[in-house]
């Protein structure tokens, strides 16, 4: 049988059809029909395969039965034939009659068996040929399938892309074909093995059959020969019979003596031969029966072989069909693979295109943000130009009035008109540029929309990347687990190091005792110096003014108080003096030429420093009248002609002070070596516990500078703790005490957080800001900090003293701001050592000691290692800063004309900026004009404020002050004078009743000057974090709000991005709660006292739910009988404004937050009833007639706020006057009448869309 090879699938035709766009649908329909046919063929092939396998198993079983029967018959033949032949030859020789027809029948049967065997051999050869053909067909089909496997896979991918819901089963077809190949290969191996075994058995049977045929032929010849001899004669028969007998029988013959045979023996022998012949005939009959049974069995075996051959033929046909189908499937598979390759290439190109589009989108967003920032800057500049234009117009009118009497003013007027014309031209250019920028902004918005449309194409790729991200997250989790184990081992090592640090602390305490002893010696020397001063004062001038004696007494008191209070503060390293400002020096010609070389060099340094009087002033507000005296104002007192004795005494005192300085310097070096060892241990602990914190290595013997660069100050600004320091005047000691906490290791920083609140109660001058890197604490955790024992805090302070070394500060690279910060202590030290030496007459002797004290403490002051000073000194400095601001108020100076010290005082007292930002502004900002002209990027680059919310706070405050101090600003109604500024006495009178309360809150206790002067003056970040957020039920975000210094100015400018990224408020419900809290503040016009008054009035009554806090809501829930569920809304954001203003917040939402089970219907009914009563009695919401479950705002809410409504902000009479100019939004009465009930929804939509407000505070 020849193998019919199926024609291969033409691959060019479908590809060419796909290439043409017109015939695409025909190829798809053809391919679908082909796939349907393949599925049908697959089903039929599977059915036929099952049938063939069943028939093959039956044939194999029958063949095994036949082989077993054949083996049994063969054994019978082997056991029976040799004996039968021997007996047959013996019996036939002696028998008289035989049965020739039986032998003929046996011969015929043998011939028939031989013919049947030949036929079977032919059939077996045909079956072999058919099996070879089947194998060839299978191989051909496998080749076709492998060739078309790629095209089939491409088709599958295409169909899946077209209709993802209805995925076809081509993949299953391919899998079935592959399994069919494997099955047929295994089946072919089994058939080959069985055929080989069968052939071996057949060859063995043929050999046995040939041997049996030879034996039968020999028996047949013997039978013929016997019959011939029996037919000849009887005698001859006997003789032949005797000859044919065996030799053993002849031995028994007996002959007579005369040679004849005995007759009795002959008869007995004949009888025996007859018996043998009968026995042989019987056995011959049995053999015939056996042969007949064997022939019938052979016939059955032939029939079974015929059926097996037919089954094999069917199997080969099915195999051929399977091979044909498999070849077709392989061709389709190759086609699909080609399609898949094409789609993969398209996918890669699309992926690259989406990546480029995404990059372009990011670039466009950045450009858009920059354009918006530039646009805002242009608007600000435009507003400033308009203000300048108004000022110029006013001046022009005044000039025109004076023109009649003052003709020389006309020239000046002409100049101003020219300047005004130039300003108008610049204004016109700016407007044109703004229009151009608006056009560009519209184009960018269009490009952004197109980019967002293209960005949607990347979603599928992002989904695929999510699996990879999950895998990476699991790997990172494993790495973090390993890292955690390493951290635990490091903690054990840290405990050992802490024990070592305790020993170093003891050594430090011993050094502190030595320092106290030295302080006593210094006190003794001070008394001696006082005596010397009295003597020298009597020699120089007998009469000393009383004021000067008071000044010297004040100095003695301050120095003595420093020495006495030295042991109270463990973190103090050296003796501190009250910090003094750098005095101004006039450039006068020196009148004394007889000074020593050392003093003359110092005088030259003072002259050089006096050429830059305000370049790097650290604290200009500290200048007093005594310090304003210059070095050369009293040079005539030290001329050689009149006062040589005083000069000699001064030189002697200077030598004694130098000796004292050397001795103290040696003691300090010994103490610093002990502190350096403790610092090394602290650095080791910090490197183990906090890997990301870069602590500077300690280098013994190096001089430690007092400043940190502006960038490092801004980037490492610590978040506020439980209570940030009260807004007292910041000394460098307290500034660096705040910054020193940042350099602590993580475990010590946590320890310091616990003791910050307790230390604040007893030591107001030691308040620190703790770094809250841990999750936000809850109010319960905050209350627990007040129960710590005092001894525990004392131990903590003593253990923390070793970590406040100046080397632990992160000193950045040197830049201009750092250099300017370095100049202040150096100038002050030189001034104190020379200027006070040659001061007034009553300070001639005492100036040496004061110069020594100031020289030794100057470098220590900026690092915050000593106490602030006496209370009188603090009050004096605070008064100086108040006087600076009051002077600006009296002169009516705009903000742009403020000098550097006034701006710094404003930042500290009015704005309440932290010390690190104040220091950066002091170094970089020299006037209000520079401050007001700074843009957002310039604030970040020049001052180093990296936090965008900090920059927003500063910009809003600057805009507020610019609008308040401009000449066009209207007077306010909160102060008696009608101005935003009030005098120090007026403000003290206003703030006297509220001073106790403010001191408890810790925000403006030390600075009562600016209470209630602005709408947001009493709502700084302290109030927001400590009071307002807990009242909203969101105390967990307190640390983030305090870290970002969020005050009331900033609340209306916070976007969704700010809340999510910087303030970590990712919960949408919490953002909604915050927004309704802001709306409540707007309704109250940001009046803190009004809010507190209304809350106090509604403490025990169900009314005015708008101002209810989270605690008040909890108490209401407890009062209605749901005490067990009340605490579940702690830190949930549920407060009165949310209940009163949110139309979507009903009793079911409250029940969900209270975690009341749904099966507890009684509690839910109680809550529903009481909640409805609460809405009816305490809010402006009322039941809707159509649905009792939904509420809407009634029409009576406008009566509470009759004057006007601006975007949901209630403006009470006179309240708009207290707002800055940027907050006075104009609106018509029609707009106020159109105010609808969807105020809350519009607010929330604005917040969720992350829009940026254009008006500013």
UniProtKB/Swiss-Prot annotation:
Residue intervals of the SAM domain: 898-964, 1020-1084, 1108-1177
Biased composition (Low complexity): 16-26, 709-725, 798-813
Subcellular location, record wording: Cytoplasm; Cell surface; Cell projection, Dendritic spine
Modified residues (Phosphoserine): 236, 239, 687, 689, 817, 820
Main localization of the protein described in the UniProt heading: cytoplasm
Molecular function, one GO term: structural constituent of presynapse
Keyword ATP-binding attached: no
Superkingdom per UniProt: Eukaryota
Pfam families: SAM_1, SAM_2
Modified residues (Phosphothreonine): 237
Gene Ontology terms describing biological process: cell-matrix adhesion; dense core granule cytoskeletal transport; regulation of dendritic spine development; regulation of dendritic spine morphogenesis; regulation of synaptic vesicle exocytosis; synapse organization
A single GO cellular-component term on record: presynaptic active zone
Biased composition (Basic and acidic residues): 238-256
Segments for region (Disordered): 1-29, 231-265, 438-463, 709-738, 790-834
The keyword Cytoplasm belongs to this UniProt entry's keyword annotation: yes
Tissue: Expressed only in brain.
Domain notes for this protein: The N-terminal coiled coil regions mediate homodimerization preferentially and heterodimerization type alpha/alpha. The C-terminal, non-coiled coil regions mediate heterodimerization type alpha/beta and interaction with PTPRD, PTPRF and PTPRS.
Function (record text): Alters PTPRF cellular localization and induces PTPRF clustering. May regulate the disassembly of focal adhesions. May localize receptor-like tyrosine phosphatases type 2A at specific sites on the plasma membrane, possibly regulating their interaction with the extracellular environment and their association with substrates. In neuronal cells, is a scaffolding protein in the dendritic spines which acts as immobile postsynaptic post able to recruit KIF1A-driven dense core vesicles to dendritic spines.
Subunit description: Forms homodimers and heterodimers with liprins-alpha and liprins-beta. Interacts with the second PTPase domain of PTPRD, PTPRF and PTPRS. Interacts with KIF1A; the interaction decreases in presence of calcium.
UniProt family annotation: Belongs to the liprin family. Liprin-alpha subfamily.
Name of the protein in its database record: Liprin-alpha-2
Origin species: Homo sapiens (Human)
Gene: PPFIA2
């Amino acid at each position: 049988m020849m193998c019919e090879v199926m024609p291969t699938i033409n691959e060019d035709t479908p590809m060419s059809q796909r290439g043409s766009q017109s015939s695409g649908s025909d190829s798809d329909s053809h391919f679908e029909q082909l796939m349907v046919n393949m599925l049908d063929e697959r089903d039929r092939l599977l059915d036929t395969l099952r049938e063939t396998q069943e028939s093959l198993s039956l044939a194999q079983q029958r063949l095994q039965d036949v082989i077993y029967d054949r083996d049994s018959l063969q054994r019978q033949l082997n056991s029976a034939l040799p004996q039968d032949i021997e007996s047959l030859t013996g019996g036939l020789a002696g028998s008289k009659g035989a049965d020739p027809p039986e032998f003929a029948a046996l011969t015929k049967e043998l011939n028939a068996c031989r013919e049947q065997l030949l036929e079977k051999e032919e059939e077996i050869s045909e079956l072999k040929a058919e099996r070879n053909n089947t194998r060839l067909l299978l191989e051909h089909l496998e080749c076709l399938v492998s060739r078309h496997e790629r095209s089939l896979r491409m088709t599958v991918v295409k169909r899946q892309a077209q209709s993802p819901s209805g995925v076809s089963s081509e993949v299953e077809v391919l899998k079935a074909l592959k399994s069919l190949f494997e099955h047929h290969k295994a089946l072919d191996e089994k058939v080959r093995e069985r055929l080989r075994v069968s052939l071996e058995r057949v060859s063995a049977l043929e050999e046995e059959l040939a041997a049996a045929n030879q034996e039968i032929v020999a028996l047949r010849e013997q039978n013929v020969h016997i019959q011939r001899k029996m037919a000849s004669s009887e005698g001859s028969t006997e003789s032949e019979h005797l000859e044919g007998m065996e030799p053993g029988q002849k031995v028994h013959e007996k002959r007579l003596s005369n040679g004849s045979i005995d007759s009795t023996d002959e008869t007995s022998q004949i009888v025996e031969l007859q018996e043998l012949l009968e026995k042989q005939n019987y056995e011959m009959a049995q053999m015939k029966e056996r042969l007949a049974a064997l022939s019938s069995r052979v016939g059955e075996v032939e029939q079974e072989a015929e059926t097996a051959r037919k089954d094999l033929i069917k199997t080969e046909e099915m195999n051929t069909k399977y091979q044909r189908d498999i070849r077709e499937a392989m061709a389709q598979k190759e086609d699909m693979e080609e399609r898949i390759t094409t789609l993969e290439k398209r996918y890669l190109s699309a992926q690259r295109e989406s990546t480029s589009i995404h990059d372009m989108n990011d670039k466009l967003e950045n450009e858009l943000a920059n354009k918006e920032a530039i646009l805002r800057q242009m608007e600000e500049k435009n507003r400033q130009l308009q203000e300048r234009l108004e000022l110029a117009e006013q001046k022009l009118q005044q000039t025109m009035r004076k023109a009649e009497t003052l003709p020389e003013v006309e020239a000046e007027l002409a100049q101003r008109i020219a300047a005004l014309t130039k300003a108008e031209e610049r204004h016109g250019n700016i407007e044109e540029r703004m229009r151009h920028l608006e056009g560009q902004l519209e184009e960018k918005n269009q490009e952004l929309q197109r980019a967002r449309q293209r960005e949607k194409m990347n979603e599928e790729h992002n989904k695929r990347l999510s699996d990879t991200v999950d895998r990476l997250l699991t790997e990172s989790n494993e790495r973090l687990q390993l890292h955690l184990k390493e951290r635990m081992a490091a903690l054990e090592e840290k405990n050992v190091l802490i024990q070592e640090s305790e020993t170093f602390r003891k050594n430090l305490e011993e050094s502190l005792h030595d320092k106290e002893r030295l302080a006593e010696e210094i006190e003794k020397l001070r008394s001696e110096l006082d005596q010397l001063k009295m003597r020298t004062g009597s020699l120089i001038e007998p009469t000393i003014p009383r004021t000067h004696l008071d000044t010297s007494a004040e100095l003695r008191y301050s120095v003595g108080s420093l020495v006495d209070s030295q042991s109270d503060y463990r973190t103090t390293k050296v003796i501190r003096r009250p910090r003094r400002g750098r005095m101004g020096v006039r450039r006068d010609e020196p009148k004394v030429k007889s000074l020593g070389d050392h003093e003359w060099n110092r005088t030259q340094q003072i002259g050089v420093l006096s050429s830059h009087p305000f370049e790097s002033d650290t604290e200009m507000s500290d200048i007093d009248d005594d310090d304003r005296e210059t070095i050369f104002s009293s040079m005539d007192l030290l001329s050689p002609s009149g006062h040589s004795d005083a000069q000699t005494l001064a030189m002697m005192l200077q030598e004694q002070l130098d000796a004292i300085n050397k001795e103290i310097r040696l003691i300090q070096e010994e103490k610093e070596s002990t502190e350096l060892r403790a610092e090394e241990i602290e650095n080791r602990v910090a490197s183990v516990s906090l890997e990301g914190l870069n602590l500077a290595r300690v280098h013994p013997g190096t001089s430690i500078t007092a400043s940190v660069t502006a960038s490092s100050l801004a980037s490492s600004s610590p978040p506020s703790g439980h209570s940030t320091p009260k807004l007292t005047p910041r000394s460098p000691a307290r500034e660096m005490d705040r910054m020193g906490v940042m350099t602590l290791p993580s475990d010590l920083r946590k320890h310091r957080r616990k003791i910050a609140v307790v230390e604040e109660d007893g030591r107001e001058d030691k308040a620190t800001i703790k770094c809250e890197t841990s999750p936000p604490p809850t109010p319960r955790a905050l209350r627990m900090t007040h129960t710590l024992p005092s001894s525990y805090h004392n131990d903590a302070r003593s253990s923390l003293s070793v970590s406040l070394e100046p080397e632990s500060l992160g000193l950045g690279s040197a830049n201009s701001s750092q250099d300017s910060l370095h100049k202040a202590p150096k100038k002050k030290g030189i001034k104190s050592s020379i200027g006070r030496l040659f001061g007034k007459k009553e300070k001639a002797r005492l100036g040496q000691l004061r110069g020594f004290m100031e020289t030794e403490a100057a470098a220590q002051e900026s690092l915050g290692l000593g106490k602030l000073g006496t209370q009188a000194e603090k009050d004096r400095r605070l008064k100086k800063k108040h006087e600076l601001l009051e002077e600006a108020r009296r002169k009516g100076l705009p903000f742009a004309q403020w000098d550097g010290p006034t701006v710094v005082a404003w930042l500290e007292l009015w704005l309440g900026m932290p010390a690190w930002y104040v220091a950066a502004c002091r170094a970089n900002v020299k006037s209000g004009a520079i401050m007001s002209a700074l843009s957002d990027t310039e604030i970040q680059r020049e001052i180093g404020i990296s936090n965008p919310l900090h920059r927003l706070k500063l910009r809003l405050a600057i805009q507020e002050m610019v609008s308040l101090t401009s000449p066009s600003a209207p007077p306010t109604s909160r102060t008696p004078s009608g101005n935003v500024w009030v005098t120090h006495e007026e403000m003290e009178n206003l703030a006297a009743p509220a001073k106790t309360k403010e001191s408890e809150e810790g925000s403006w206790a030390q600075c009562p000057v600016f209470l209630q002067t602005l709408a947001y003056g009493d709502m700084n970040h302290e109030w927001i974090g400590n009071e307002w957020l807990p009242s909203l039920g969101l105390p967990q975000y307190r640390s983030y709000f305090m870290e970002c210094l969020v005050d009331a100015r900033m609340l209306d400018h916070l976007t969704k991005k700010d809340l999510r990224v910087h303030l970590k408020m990712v919960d949408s419900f919490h953002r909604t709660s915050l927004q309704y809290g802001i709306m409540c503040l707007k309704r109250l016009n940001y009046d803190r006292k009004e809010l507190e008054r209304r809350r106090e009035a509604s403490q025990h009554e169900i009314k005015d739910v708008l101002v209810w806090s989270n605690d008040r809501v909890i108490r209401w829930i407890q009062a209605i009988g749901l005490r067990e569920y009340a605490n579940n809304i702690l830190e949930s954001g549920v407060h009165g404004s949310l209940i009163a203003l949110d139309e979507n917040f009903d009793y079911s939402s409250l029940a969900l937050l209270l975690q009341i089970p749904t099966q507890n219907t009684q509690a839910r009914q109680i809550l529903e009833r009481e909640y409805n009563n609460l809405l009816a009695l305490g809010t402006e919401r009322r039941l809707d007639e159509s649905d009792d479950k939904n509420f809407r705002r009634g029409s009576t809410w406008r009566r509470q706020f009759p004057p006007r409504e601006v975007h949901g902000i209630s403006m009470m009479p006179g309240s708009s006057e207290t707002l800055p100019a940027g907050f006075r939004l104009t609106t018509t009465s029609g707009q106020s009448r159109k105010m609808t009930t969807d105020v809350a929804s519009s607010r929330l939509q604005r917040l969720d869309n992350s829009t940026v407000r254009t008006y500013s505070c």
